[in-house]
């Protein structure tokens, strides 16, 4: 009966399937729109530059591609001769990869448009208010600060990957009725699997090392959406238990299930027994492939949810999810990494003196505070990968930037430093940011000295405060005016308050290394 109820729930939500406009792939303006829709020339300009042509020739390649797509047997030729790298009947390896990338990117853009229109139309019908401030990544941390201080347990979840490519097609099959589009998607995934082992270091095909990002990002988002879709259903089913009266719930579950073993239900244990069986309210936060599940329940309750998730991924997506990808810990003694921050709960014991008439009492209490700091080792590791410092944190020069002008070098280092300071403005300890600023500042000085074949001391004496101003963020300038005692150029004089900004829509590249 319960299985039937779950099936009806899934069919009810998925009943509104979206028709896919397959003929759009034969329209030239779709490829032009795909190029302007955020590709930044990744599939049109880079290949033509390698071929020695100008950028206008991309329209010629699009027309050539559409003509080949109209051929009756292009998919058959491509499938039967996949070992020869033939695509759309073309023997040239470069054009085969290039045409495939053009179609896959346009395919992804069309799906994005259709599902975006569907989302907008549904939100207009429901009159859902749009809160643009909540688009910021930093808006997650005030939510965690408000909720986690009252919770006990947390599950650190890594969403399983990779999954079988056919599962991605089946996920879209629930929402797309156009069969040719699904066959085309299967064809792309099959070709990508073959090409993935054929990429070499040749300059002519180097551009394909970052191909099809839009398509696979879209498929991954649909996969995550499917996971969260069923998770919300399980959450709704568990929340129903909270609406059940305590007495009825105890009678149905506890009394009849344990009547053979319990002779008397003690009144003192009544609340504890009810708390064990009721389903505490849970909080779920996710970014990219990492999610956090926090609850006020017991460790046994979190283990039940872990079992639910593992079985769900196993039976719903038909692949085994390693249980060790879900870590259950107590919030009181656990620190977790999320969105580049190291977060934890700080417990500060306090003694409060209470005076009542002639009697006084000392009350011991504990204040819980959600704390976020910028981790030192991951940031230095990211700077090391980007060739700004060594693994020990010693600044080094950036040889690839020595051909730039002095203004460009200083501007690049300054923008990186300001972006990191802006992103980690919510850190309660600024010492890590001071160290990162120090590394970037002296890496900039070493790069300038290397470009002019001089010493670092010479440039530091010549530029002085001018170089330091480039690493001085706007918020620090404003706060230096508000708090005059803070010296503008003192590394240890900056503010210690945490600030969350509402204009950060993506994680910093150095944070995401």
Swiss-Prot record:
A biological-process GO annotation: RNA splicing
Leader peptide range in chain numbering: none
Principal place of residence: plastid
Any GO molecular function: RNA binding
Keywords: Chloroplast, mRNA processing, Plastid, RNA-binding, tRNA processing
Ubl conjugation recorded as keyword: no
Secreted found in the keyword field: no
Top-level taxonomic group: Eukaryota
Gene Ontology cellular component terms for the protein in this record: chloroplast
Bridged cysteine pairs (disulfide): none
Listed InterPro entries: Domain_X, Maturase_MatK, Maturase_MatK_N
Localization of this protein: Plastid, Chloroplast
Family: Belongs to the intron maturase 2 family. MatK subfamily.
Stated role: Usually encoded in the trnK tRNA gene intron. Probably assists in splicing its own and other chloroplast group II introns.
Protein name: Maturase K
Underlying gene: matK
């Amino acid at each position: 009966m319960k299985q039937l109820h779950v099936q009806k729930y899934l069919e009810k939500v998925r009943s509104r399937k979206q028709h896919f406009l397959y003929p759009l792939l034969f329209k030239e303006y779709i490829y032009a729109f795909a190029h302007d829709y955020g590709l930044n020339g990744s599939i049109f300009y880079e290949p033509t530059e390698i071929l020695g042509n100008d950028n206008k020739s991309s329209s010629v390649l699009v027309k050539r591609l559409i003509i080949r797509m109209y051929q009756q047997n292009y998919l058959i030729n491509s499938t039967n001769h996949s070992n020869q790298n033939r695509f759309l009947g073309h023997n040239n390896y470069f054009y085969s990869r290039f045409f495939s990338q053009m179609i896959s990117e346009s395919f992804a853009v069309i799906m994005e448009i259709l599902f975006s229109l569907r989302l907008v139309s549904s939100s207009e019908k429901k009159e859902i208010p749009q809160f643009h401030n909540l688009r910021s990544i930093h808006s997650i941390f005030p939510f965690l600060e408000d909720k986690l201080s009252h919770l006990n347990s947390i599950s650190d979840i890594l969403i399983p990957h990779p999954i079988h490519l056919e599962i991605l097609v089946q996920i879209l099959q629930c929402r797309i009725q156009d069969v040719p589009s699904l066959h085309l998607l299967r064809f792309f995934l099959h070709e990508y699997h073959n090409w993935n082992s054929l990429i070499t270091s040749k300059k002519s095909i180097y551009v394909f090392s970052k191909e099809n990002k839009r398509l696979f990002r879209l498929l991954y988002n649909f996969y995550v959406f499917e996971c969260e879709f069923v998770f919300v259903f399980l959450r709704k089913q568990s929340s129903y238990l909270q609406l059940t009266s305590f007495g009825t719930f105890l009678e149905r579950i506890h009394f009849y299930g344990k009547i053979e073993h319990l002779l008397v239900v003690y009144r003192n244990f009544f609340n504890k027994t009810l708390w064990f069986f009721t389903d505490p309210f849970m909080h779920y936060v996710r970014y990219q492939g990492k999610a956090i599940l926090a609850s006020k329940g017991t460790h046994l309750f979190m283990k039940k949810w872990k079992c639910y998730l593992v079985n769900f991924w196993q039976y719903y997506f038909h692949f085994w999810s390693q249980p060790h990808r879900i870590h259950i810990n107590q919030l009181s003694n656990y620190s977790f990494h999320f969105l580049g921050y190291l977060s934890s709960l700080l417990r500060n014991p306090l003694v409060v003196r209470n005076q009542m008439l002639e009697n006084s009492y000392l009350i011991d209490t504990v204040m819980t505070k959600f704390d976020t700091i910028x981790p030192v080792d991951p940031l230095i590791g990211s700077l090391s990968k980007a060739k700004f410092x060594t693994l020990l944190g010693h600044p080094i020069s950036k040889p690839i930037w020595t051909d730039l002008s002095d203004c460009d070098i200083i501007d690049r280092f300054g923008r990186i430093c300001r972006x990191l300071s802006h992103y980690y403005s919510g850190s309660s300890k600024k010492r890590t940011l001071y160290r990162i600023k120090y590394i970037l500042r002296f890496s900039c000085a070493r790069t300038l000295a290397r470009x002019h074949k001089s010493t670092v001391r010479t440039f530091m004496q010549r530029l002085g405060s001018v170089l330091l101003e480039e690493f001085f963020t706007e918020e620090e300038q404003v706060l230096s005016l508000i708090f005059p005692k803070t010296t503008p150029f003192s590394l240890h004089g900056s503010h210690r308050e945490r600030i969350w900004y509402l204009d950060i829509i993506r994680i910093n590249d150095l944070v995401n290394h």
